[in-house]
Amino acid sequence: IRQFGSGVVGMPSGSIEEVFRKVESGDAAYGIVPIENSTEGAVNRTMDCLLKTPLFIVGECSIPIQHNLMTRSGSMEGVTRVYSHPQSLGQCVQWLNRNVPSLERLTAESNGEAARLASENPTYAAVAGEVAAKIFGLQIVAANIQDSSTNRTRFLILGREPAEPSANPREDKTSLIFSVPHRAGSLYQALKPFDDFGVSMMRLDSRPAKRGTWEYFFYTDIEGNMSEPKIREALEIFREGCASLKCLGSYPTEKNFRRSDTKGSNL
């Protein structure tokens, strides 16, 4: 709502992959997926989906994340398992170790799925947000169990068409996925044009190429918009040093995001 306004219609999804599918098929106009957390780092499922999707990143937002332990009864009596998304379990690991060390920890596709499982079995608990507790009729046993008081997650906004440059494209962000030849120094040489043209890199993560060899894809955010001559020139030279390159889009950063007319749109 903060990004799109009150006219947006929410469509909950059971997994990150489902969000991509709904936007790709046209069932939803936009999708929102997590990309990185201040405690646990990159969300690998999202990075893998970005590699294959035809969608574009059109915006971003970040929010503080609060996790709660919840059950059907509001009590931990008889509870033997706790479900949550792997990232959420990681963000609460110290609290769980201190307070419920005997619970078996199992992963779910999403925190919403974890809450659904807990709603169907009195021996299950879930780590999820307050909204999930309301949707699935669960009682919060312990609130704000995340280990970091400054826990935040950055989300990407996905669309089928690229975003228009903002009023100040120099403050936009461009996201790329690329691979480099499998030889010494290739990553350094590939990234050198960004330094030569004074383009700031804001993030660099790697993911296995999953081809059975020690090869990787890299995900990076650079400062600026592809509409800028400097960015275009840097990318042209950058492309020469890459084995593959996919541009995920140029888009306004969170502070510069201006919501468009999304009245009646599905999100």
PLM regions with names:
Residues 1-267:
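Domain-level signature for soluble enzymes in the chorismate/prephenate branch of the shikimate pathway
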